[in-house]
């Protein structure tokens, strides 16, 4: 298991670009924007897997039971299907730790 090195602050600007090119087609960021193909990400940090109202999760997501934080997102974003076998998340993951830190830094600000 890799753990996020939170002492290495990511670049939110680079994270914004990653979100736009890799995530925005399926996810929204702000309260009230609603679910798309994937659940809205508003309030992501501190939320349990499989808990966004109105989104149809797989049993695997509902039963994972972890809380989204820097370290859990860091591991998940490397390979979502490995972290939650049975997820319907189609995204293949971000292999570079720097990219994951950049995206997490962006998400920490934009999903509040």
Curated annotation (Swiss-Prot):
Heme c binds at residues 23, 26-27, 89. The modification N6,N6,N6-trimethyllysine is found at residues 81, 95. The keyword Metal-binding applies. It is found in: Mitochondrion intermembrane space. The keyword Hydrolase does not apply. Signal peptide: none annotated. GO terms for cellular component: mitochondrial intermembrane space. Coiled coil: none annotated. Keywords: Electron transport, Heme, Iron, Metal-binding, Methylation, Mitochondrion, Respiratory chain, Transport. Gene3D superfamilies: Cytochrome c-like domain. Electron carrier protein. The oxidized form of the cytochrome c heme group can accept an electron from the heme group of the cytochrome c1 subunit of cytochrome reductase. Cytochrome c then transfers this electron to the cytochrome oxidase complex, the final protein carrier in the mitochondrial electron-transport chain. Belongs to the cytochrome c family. This is Cytochrome c. The gene is CC-1.
């Amino acid at each position: 298991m890799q753990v996020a090195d939170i002492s290495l602050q990511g670049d939110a600007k680079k994270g914004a670009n990653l979100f736009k090119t890799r995530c925005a087609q399926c996810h929204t960021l702000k309260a009230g924007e609603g679910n798309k193909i994937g659940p809205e990400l508003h309030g992501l940090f501190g939320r349990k897997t499989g808990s966004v109202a109105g989104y149809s999760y797989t049993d695997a997501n509902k039963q994972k039971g972890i809380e989204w934080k820097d370290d859990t997102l860091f591991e998940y974003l490397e390979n979502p299907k490995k972290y939650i076998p049975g997820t319907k998340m189609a995204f293949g993951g971000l292999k570079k730790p720097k990219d994951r830190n950049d995206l997490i830094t962006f998400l920490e600000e934009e999903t509040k």
